[in-house]
């Protein structure tokens, strides 16, 4: 084997390479037909896909808990949510391999996190912060390459929310402050 540590260093790439090698072997006429080469290759590929799905699930949990913490800052569960953010993010970071970056479905991760947070907040009679952007405002690097600064992540999420018309009453849009005239 050319790179004996690839299995340990990057299971996703290893699985893809092994599946391709098995398919190439399976196409050789001189080899026995007793081995179901295509399905063996598919099973090995599924190892890599499973690892990707695990990281996606952990990222969904990380983001969902961030959204809950942001949307319901006074909820009794806020301390628990903060612990969960740290736990899920660390687990995602430990399992993440660089080859996964292009395979992670970032749009689905963000959408699933928003849906999961919304469902959970309803149980507490809370609602999601309105105006969240369609794309995740937290970069993959922020989520996967270092220990997450939870307060910074919460500020970034809050700053990315686009105020809705009902929220605009708390903002002043006039360039000049209004002055009162007295008679």
Give, region by region, the residue ranges found by the protein language model.
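Surface/interface-facing alpha-helical segments and adjacent flexible terminal/loop regions used
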Residues: 1-60, 64-183
């Amino acid at each position: 084997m050319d790179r004996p540590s690839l299995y340990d260093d990057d299971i996703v790439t290893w699985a893809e390479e092994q599946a391709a090698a098995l398919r190439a072997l399976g196409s050789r006429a001189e080899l026995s037909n007793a081995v179901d080469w295509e399905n063996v290759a598919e099973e090995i590929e599924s190892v890599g896909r499973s690892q990707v799905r695990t990281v996606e699930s952990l990222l969904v949990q990380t983001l969902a808990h961030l959204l809950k913490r942001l949307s319901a800052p006074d909820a009794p569960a806020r301390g628990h949510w903060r612990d969960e953010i740290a736990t899920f993010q660390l687990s995602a970071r430990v399992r993440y391999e660089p080859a996964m970056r292009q395979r992670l479905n970032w749009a689905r991760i963000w959408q699933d996190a928003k849906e999961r947070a919304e469902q959970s907040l309803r149980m507490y009679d809370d609602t999601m912060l309105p105006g969240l952007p369609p794309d995740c405002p937290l970069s993959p690097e922020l989520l996967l390459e270092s220990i997450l600064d939870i307060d910074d992540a919460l500020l970034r999420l809050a700053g990315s929310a686009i105020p809705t018309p009902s929220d605009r009453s708390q903002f002043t849009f006039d360039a000049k402050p209004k002055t009162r005239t007295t008679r």
